[in-house]
Amino acid sequence: MPNTTEEQSDEVNNLALEKCLKVLQEAQTDNEQFAALLLVTKCAQAQEINNETRRRIFDAVGFTFPNRLLFSNSVPEGCPQNLFKSLGITLLACFSTDPVLAVHPQVVNKIPIFNETINISCQSGNKEVVSMVEDAYQCLLGILASPQGPKNLLSHGSIPYLCQAYMNRNHFWEKALQILTSLLTVLPPKCWKKSCTDLQLLLTRLSEEFGKEEGEWKFQLADLLPIFLPPSPILLETSWGKQCLKQLCKGLLKILSNKLSISQRDPALKLAACLANSYGSSWIMAENKVVRSRFLALIVNLACVEVRMALEEPEPLTSRQSVITACYALVEMGILACTKEEKHPVLGKEQKLQLIGVMQEACAAIIYYLQQVGWEKQEDPFLLASVRLLGAWLAEETACLKLEVIQLLPFLVHYMRTCHQRSVICSKLPKEVSQVALLSNSWGNIWPGDAIRFLLPALCHLSAEEVPRKVLISEGVPALLCDYFQLQWDVLFAEDEPEGLQSAAELSLQTCCGVFLNLVVTEPTFVGQESCFVSLMKLLMQSLPTLLTKEGHLVLVANFSTLGLMMSRLLAENSVLHESNAEEFFKAAIHFLSHSHVPSCQTDAGKPVITLSESYSEAWEEISELWFLGVQAFSSCVHLLPWLSALVLRSSWLQDTLCLLDNVSPKSVDSDLVTALQGMLTELAQSSSCCRDVIREKGGAEKANLYGMAALEQCLAELS
C-alpha cells in the first residue's frame, strides 16, 4: 500500500507546480517569466517532470526566452554570474528529455554552449555551477539519444570537450565517458578521423590507469577499453601506441594471473581478444621475452579452458557465447604463434607443444559442439565463429582428430552450401533490397559471413588425402567450389566492393585453385567426366586474359594458368577446348610462362647470368612450383592439341627461349629449369615439323648438347 504521508507530499508538490505553471503562462514581462521559472525549477527538476508538464512549460516559454537567457551579458546585482545561463540550460535540459524537442535545431545548435559548460571549473563546489554542468550533460545525453544525435555531437565538436572533461576529472566526468563510449560505438572511424589527437591522449590516460589501478575501476576499464581502441591497427606504428600496449599488457597480466570471478575475468579476455584481432601476438609487450612468452601461453591456455568448459557441457550456455567468441580469437592467435616461422619466436619448443595440445582439446570441444547442435543452429552467428576457428586449426593440422573431422565433413559441407546460397541470392539483388532481405531473418543486419573462405585452407589439405577427399566428392564440394569460384571472381573486380573484400576474394580464388589442382592430380577420371569442371574451364579461359591486363595479380595469374593447363590435358577432347576463346587462354598462359627468366647484368665467362624478371622475383617463392608445373602441363598439351604448336611459334616463345639459352651462361641455368625447358622443346619438336625446323635453325642440337638435354638431342637426331 502507498504511504499516506508520501501521497500527501506528492499532492502538495503537484498543486505548487500547477500554481507556478499558471503564473508562468500569465507572465507578461521578462521579470515575471524569470520569477515564475525560478519557482518551477524549485518545484520540479527536469528528470522529474512528465511529458505533459514539460510540454506546458515549452508552450509557455518556447525557445526565445531560453535563448535570451543564454546570451544575456548582465545579471541582477548580487546574483550569481551564471544565473541566466544556468536557467537557460536548465530549460533546455528539460526540453531535451522530450525526443521531439531534443532534435529541434534550437537545441542542437546549442551544443557548443553545452560543450563549454561541462568544462567550467567547479572546484569551489558552487551548487549552482554544479547544477548547470549536470544540466548541460542532460542536454548532450538527450541529443545523443536521437537517431542523428551522434552525428550532431560529432559535427559540433563535442569529442575534445568530453575528453578534456574526463582528463581533468571535472564534475560528472563519468557522463563524459558515457557519451564518448556511445559515440565511439556508433561512429568509430569518423570519431578518430575528426578528433584523433584528443582520442590518442584519452586512450593513453585510460591505458595508464588500467596499468596502475588495483581496485574495481580496473575491471570497468577492461570493459570499456575495447571501444576506445583505434579502428585501424596503428598502435604498433607509434611510440604513444606502443606505450599504450605496454600498459594494457601490464593491466591484463595482473588480472589474468589471479583467480577471479567470471564477471571480472570475462572483460579482460574480451580486451585481449580485440588486441589479438588487430595485432596477432605482436601486441604483447612485456618487460622481457620470458614474461612475454609466459603471458602469451597464459592467455591461450585460459582461452582453451573457457572453450572446453562452455562447449563440452551437454547443453552449452548461450550466455557465454560472447566471451567464448573472444576466446576463439585468442586461440587463433595461439595457432598463428605456434605455426608461423620467425627468426626470434616468442614461444619455445616445449611451450609450443603444450599449447598445441590444449588447442587440440579446444578444437575437439568445437567439433563435439558442432556435432551436437550444428544442424539445429545454422542461423546462429556463434556457429560461424566456431567454424572459423576450426578452419584455422585444420589449415595447419589435419592429422590430429582426423576421424572426428571426417565424421563432421557432411555437416561442414552443408553449412558452407547454405551460407553460399544465401550469399548468391543477396548478391543478385540491388543493395537496398539485399539489406531488407538480411533484416528479415534472425541475423539482423549482419551478414552471416563466408564459411567457405574460412574452411578453404582446410579443404586444400583434406582434398590431398584419399579418405576425406572421397567424402568431399560425395558431398558435392567440387560443384560448390566452382560456383563459389565464379562468385569470388565477380567480387574481385566489382567497382563497388570494399578493398578488403576484394583482397579476401583474391586469396580465396588462389586457395580454390589449390583444391582443384589436388583433384586434377588425384582424381583425373572424375575431373574429366564432371560437368562442373567444364564450366570451370570456361571461366578460366574467359578470366585469364582479363587478369593479365591488371597489375599486381601475378600469383593469381600463376594459379589460373597452371590449373587451366592441367585441366586441358584431361579435357582435350571436350568441345570447350575447341571454342574461340581457348586460343586466347593459351596465349595468356604462354605470356605467363615466357616472361619469367631474363639475362641479368651480371656475367659469367663473358656471358650474362640468367635471372628472374623483376615482377617474378618478388613472387617467385609463391609461384615457382606453379610455374614448373605449368610448363610441364603445357608440354603435355602440345600433342593433344595440334593447333598449339603454331600458337607457340606466333607468340615467339620458342624463338625467345632458344635465344635466351644462347645468350646466357650455361652454368647459370639450374637443372630444374633445364629439365622443364627440355620437356617443352622436345614435345614441340616431336609434334610439329615447323617447330622442329626452328629449333634446328637456332642451333637446337648444339644447345641440347651444351645444356645436357639428352632427350631433345635424341629427338632431333631421330627425326632428322
Curated annotation (Swiss-Prot):
Which N-terminal stretch is annotated as signal sequence? Answer: none
Tell me which UniProt keywords the record has, alphabetically.
Cell projection, Cytoplasm, Synapse
What compartments host this protein? Cytoplasm, Cytosol; Cell projection, Dendrite; Postsynapse
Where in the chain are disulfide-linked cysteines found?
none
Keyword Thylakoid belongs to the record: no
The answer to keyword Kinase applying to this record is no
Q: Which InterPro entries match?
A: Neurochondrin
What Pfam families does the annotation carry? Neurochondrin
Name the Gene Ontology biological process terms: neuron projection development; regulation of neuronal synaptic plasticity
Q: Which family is this protein grouped under?
A: Belongs to the neurochondrin family.
Give a short account of what the protein does: Probably involved in signal transduction, in the nervous system. Required for the spatial learning process. May also be involved in neurite outgrowth.
Q: What is this protein called?
A: Neurochondrin
> Whose protein is this, by species?
Xenopus laevis
